[in-house]
């Protein structure tokens, strides 16, 4: 998606529903109605949006939303829990077990990834594309900018339910492969992966 008229700008939270439209079909828990499924997926997304200036969206020349990318430095904070405490009140406690399992997993993998990073490294916490090719385009633009700012390496984690093989084809090196036992099924390991890519 090479287009010189595309616009990279700070992420506007009003565009969060576009991200939900993409990933709700992919990330929804098995229990609950459509409102809970959307709530749970929004909680996952918000856990990947950190309090910093490294939150971006890509628009076309007509201001149509195409993609978003979110990054985190060591020491950054995430305020998703405040949102969760307020929004979760409308759902039964047994539903919220799924949300807490997601949160535990996200925190575990974030901490594991941050532990591998130096202070001049940065983590890609999430990128979502609404249009084919827009994901690669927003990554190309943001990584070029991060490199110019002096960030040395980009880290990210993913799991076996995502297209983890994609990263091998786009300049990333696998630095850790493991199994997350709470999500394992009988005769099927739930594998996690941490990747790294040099920015400088």
PLM feature segments, named:
Residues 131-145:
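Conserved acetyl-CoA-binding loop-helix of GNAT-fold acetyltransferases
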Residues 4-6, 62-68, 122:
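Glycine-rich phosphate/pyrophosphate-binding loop shared by adenosine-nucleotide-utilizing enzymes
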Residues 4-21, 73-74:
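A short beta-loop-alpha structural element at the N-terminal edge
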Residues 73-126, 182-187:
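Conserved acyl-donor/pantetheine-binding loop and adjacent beta-alpha core of acyl/acetyltransferases
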Residues 155-157, 173-190:
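Conserved catalytic-core motifs of GNAT/GCN5-like acyltransferases
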Residues 136, 148, 160-178:
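Conserved active-site alpha-helix within GNAT-family acetyltransferase domains
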Residues 33-56, 61-65, 70:
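Active-site rim helix/loop that mediates acceptor-substrate recognition in acyltransferases
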Residues 118-122, 147-159:
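Conserved GNAT acetyl-CoA-binding A-motif
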């Amino acid at each position: 998606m090479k287009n010189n008229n595309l616009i990279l700008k700070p992420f506007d939270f009003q565009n969060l529903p576009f991200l939900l439209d993409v990933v709700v079909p992919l990330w929804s828990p098995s229990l609950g109605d459509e409102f809970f499924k959307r709530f749970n997926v929004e909680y996952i997304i918000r856990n990947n949006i950190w309090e910093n200036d490294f939150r971006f969206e890509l628009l076309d020349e007509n201001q149509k939303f195409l993609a978003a990318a979110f990054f985190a430095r060591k020491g950054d904070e995430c305020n998703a829990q405040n949102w969760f405490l307020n929004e979760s009140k409308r759902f039964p406690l047994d539903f919220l077990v799924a949300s807490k399992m997601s949160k535990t997993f996200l925190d575990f993998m974030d901490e594991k990834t941050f532990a591998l990073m130096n202070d001049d490294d940065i983590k890609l916490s999430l990128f979502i594309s609404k249009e084919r090719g827009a994901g690669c385009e927003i990554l190309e633009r943001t990584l070029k900018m991060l490199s110019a700012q002096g960030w040395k390496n980009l880290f990210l984690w993913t799991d076996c339910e995502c297209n983890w093989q994609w990263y091998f084809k786009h300049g990333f090196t696998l630095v850790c492969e493991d199994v997350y036992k709470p999500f394992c099924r009988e005769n099927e390991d739930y594998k996690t992966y941490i990747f790294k890519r040099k920015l400088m």
